[in-house]
């Protein structure tokens, strides 16, 4: 009914240089129309409707705020000299010279 008696053959080259042959046959068949009926959606009762719960017990607890960043550590300034020991002017007199 839908098959033609004549078949077509085509010869082609592959990317690798190999030859291959396709046998082309056409199938012609008439399709019958599909009949469908439109189904009206049924009205759902109030029990079947999905509603987001709004009660206090249904709400998820809120997360606490994120911790704050710590302030940056003050770095020592190299320009300031700290003198731990100030030698007295007569400090050299403490030492005895030996020859």
From Swiss-Prot:
<protein>
    <recommendedName>
        <fullName>Cyclin-dependent protein kinase inhibitor SMR7</fullName>
    </recommendedName>
</protein>
<feature type="region of interest" description="Disordered">
    <location>
        <begin position="49"/>
        <end position="70"/>
    </location>
</feature>
<dbReference type="GO" id="GO:0004860">
    <property type="term" value="F:protein kinase inhibitor activity"/>
</dbReference>
<keyword id="KW-0649">Protein kinase inhibitor</keyword>
<keyword id="KW-0131">Cell cycle</keyword>
<dbReference type="GO" id="GO:0006974">
    <property type="term" value="P:DNA damage response"/>
</dbReference>
<comment type="function">
    <text>Probable cyclin-dependent protein kinase (CDK) inhibitor that functions as a repressor of mitosis in the endoreduplication cell cycle. Acts as a potent cell cycle inhibitor, regulating a hydroxyurea-dependent checkpoint in leaves.</text>
</comment>
């Amino acid at each position: 009914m839908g098959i033609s008696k004549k078949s077509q053959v085509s010869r082609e080259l592959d990317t690798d240089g190999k030859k291959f042959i396709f046998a082309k046959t056409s199938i012609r068949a008439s399709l019958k129309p599909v009949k469908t009926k439109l189904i009206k959606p049924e009205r759902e009762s109030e029990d079947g409707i999905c509603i987001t719960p709004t009660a206090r017990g249904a709400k998820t607890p809120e997360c606490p705020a994120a911790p704050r960043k710590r302030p940056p550590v003050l770095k020592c300034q190299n320009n300031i000299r700290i003198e731990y020991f100030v030698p007295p002017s007569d400090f050299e007199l403490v030492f005895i010279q030996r020859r």
